[in-house]
Each structure stands twice: as C-alpha cells, then as structure tokens.
C-alpha cells in the first residue's frame, strides 16, 4: 500500500495523462505528452555517509529539475517530442515505506504554460525561449542549495526582465511570468525542504530497509506504466546497498549472502519482491558497495547482488 503522499502524486500523473492535449503551432502538430519520471532513493542510514551519497547524485538531480522538467512538445531536428520529467525523491532508513517522499515539480503547471503559447504562430520558438529562461534562472538557485527563499517579487522581476524583449505584449508576458514563477517557487521550496530533511534525518537511522524503499518505488512505477506504458522511467539508488533490519534478521544482506552465490540470491529476491515493474527501466547504482570500514569483499558481493537483482550488465 502506498502512503497518502505517494497516492496523491500518482493520481496527479494519471490526471496529466488524461489532460495531455494535441495543439497546433507554426503549422505543425505539437503534443504535450504525459510526464516521464526520475526516481531518486537516498540512504539515510549510518552504514554509509548520506552527505556523500547525496553529493554523488546531486548534479544529476539538478539536471532533472532544470533541463528536463518542461519537456519538449515539438519535434526538433527529427527528434521526437517528449513529456516533462517528474522528479521524486525518497529514502532508505528505518521502515523506508513510511519515510517522507518529495515530488519536486508541479508538472501540471507545465501543461498550463504550454496552453498559453500553443496558439502563438511562433509556438516552438516561444517554448524554447521559455525553457532556456527557466533553466537559466532556476539552476543557480538550486546550486546554492535552496538555502534562501525565492521571493515572489524577485521571481517576477527576473522572469519579466528576461522575457520582455521576446514577448512584447504586456498581458501575455505577465501570464507567462506568473506561471513560470509558480513552477520555480514550487521547485525551490521543495528542494530546500529536501535538503533540510536530509540534514535532520541523516543520523537518525541505524537500520536500512533497502527492500522496503525499492518495493515502494516499484508500486509507483507500476501505477505510472499502467496509465502511460510509454513513459521513460529512471531509478537512481544512492545507497551502499546493505539491507539491515535487526540482528540476525533473515533479510539482512549478510544473511542472504551467506546462503549462496550473490548473483543467484539477487535473482531470487527479485522474484520474491515481485519487483517486475522495475525490469527494463533505466537503473543506476552510483553508491552500491560504498560501505564504511574495511569491508571490501563484502561490498563487492553486495554490488554483485544488486546488479543481478536488476539484471544490469557489468
């Protein structure tokens, strides 16, 4: 079962699929496609350093939040259109299924923004301008860690100044600027909340329920693919991969690996967890095996376990 935060987020994605619209600009058909999804899972337990794990993936997170979040509703140089990316952040810790989840974009606003420019005779150029402007203003704020709020007055001023030479109509520009500010404010506030949450929780978790975190992502992916089978989904696991629930627990990584070949055990656990929705999606394991202390051989076995779990090439 999902918690209510996940359920609301997934209902929103389903709604975005229903609301996807085909619109025309510059004589060509433009489609705001349903959203794609980037999932990030960060380990808060003390078997690895949460700060190091977050630093390892943060550049990729920022790229997801800025360069991919508006999508591309037009075909460009023969490349197909694609939907906006929804970035979701969850955690490994004690009872991972019940830890907080952050959805970092208000992607429904992207549809609304597209509606504002879709009837423009230069819709594709307008969308490219909005996308580049959004990226250039949002990225420095996120690189700074979302350490300070982004006041509405400053947001409106920045976007208006950047767009006034391209969108000469005052009312049109005001409507676009308002929507862009809603999106930027939402993302900066959520990102700041994410950074603060990591700082608060990183020393609070002595156990690491990796399987619980993966099962929760699997449920979310399953729901997305049900509504949009063509969705591009990416999962990044920023964890050392050690599942530790309690002393002598049968699902501890050490107990599992003691039962036989690490690769075979990974394949067996994949079937037991019914994680089939994760088969075939893009999975990255930047922190797997990064255990603290003198555990090189054990870390290597954990790395092997997870690569076989996800059927990844070496």
Give the predicted meaning of each segment.
Residues 22-25:
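C-terminal motif of bacterial Sec signal peptides marking the signal peptidase cleavage site
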Residues 2-13:
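Bacterial N-terminal signal peptides that target proteins for export
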Residues 192-211, 251-258:
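Surface-exposed cleft-lining segments at the edges of enzyme active sites
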Residues 27-29:
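Bacterial signal peptide processing site
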Residues 242-302:
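VWA/integrin I-like adhesion module and closely mimicked acidic/polar interface patches used
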Residues 34-178, 234-236:
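Von Willebrand factor
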Residues 206-226, 261-269:
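A Trp-anchored, charged/polar loop motif used as the substrate-binding/catalytic surface
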Residues 34-51, 192-201, 283-289:
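Acidic/histidine-rich, surface-exposed loop or edge segments in extracytoplasmic proteins
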